[in-house]
Design a protein with these regions (language model features):
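A detector for small-residue-rich transmembrane helices and their helix-helix packing motifs
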Residues: 1-222
């Protein structure tokens, strides 16, 4: 089940959303010529490593990586999957709360996502990279504010592929339930994997809650 389109506001240009997508793509392209060893060093330097922050809370660089890690991705599939979700769902939230507040909202839910993942895995020395946590916050906000919007999805039935339109509440609820189950199983020793599911959960919950705060500011579109 892959979302490919939704109902968008007419006559609105979500340039902050475009800027976020363009920045993520540019960083990925910039790093493409690097060797595997150089990439490992770069990700270790600019990825978010929970152990680095929890072992030394006064380490300023560790706090900076909360932001830099949001623009790094582990591969082309990781990048394109994240950007697809941001492209589809981000513009509605930017329209709802305005350009500047959307940028603040995006980074705020990204921080919340990182905090929950670090709380669950405080001793992890594996760099966390990706915009998934922040985008999960966008999804949480979308679920609350646009539950009845129709989302076009690619639906796979064995070898048959169909495009169907279903309410956002169904698409995003299924997505969140999957994150919950995956997060639970990642707590089982030996099942940790390489996905920060609790960042997804934390970001989604933060977005669901914080959008109610952001809508109180002037400029909110009802």
């Amino acid at each position: 089940m892959i979302p490919i389109a939704d109902e968008n506001p007419k006559g609105f240009i979500p340039f902050i959303n475009y800027l976020l997508i363009a920045t993520n793509l540019a960083v990925f392209v910039f790093l493409m010529p690097e060797s595997v060893k150089e990439l490992e060093n770069f990700y270790t330097t600019f990825g978010l490593i929970p152990q680095r922050l929890t072992s030394n809370p006064l380490n300023l660089h560790a706090y900076i990586t909360i932001f830099t890690s949001m623009f790094l991705h582990g591969g082309l599939g990781h990048l394109l999957g994240n950007m697809l979700y941001l492209w589809i769902f981000g513009d509605n939230i930017e329209y709802l709360i305005g350009h500047r507040r959307y940028l603040i909202f995006y980074f705020t839910v990204g921080i919340a996502a990182a905090i929950l993942q670090m709380a669950v895995r405080p001793d992890s020395a594996i760099p966390m990279v990706g915009a998934s946590g922040a985008i999960s916050g966008v999804l949480g906000a979308y679920l609350l504010k646009f539950p009845k919007n129709r989302v076009s999805i690619l639906f796979f039935i064995i070898i048959i592929i169909r495009i169907i339109r279903v309410p956002a509440i169904i698409v995003l609820s299924i997505w969140f339930i999957f994150q919950l189950f995956s997060g639970y199983y990642s707590l089982v020793p030996g099942m940790e994997g390489g996905v920060a599911y609790f960042a997804h959960i934390g970001g989604f919950a933060a977005g669901f809650i914080l959008i109610k705060i952001f809508e109180r500011f002037p400029g909110y579109k009802h």
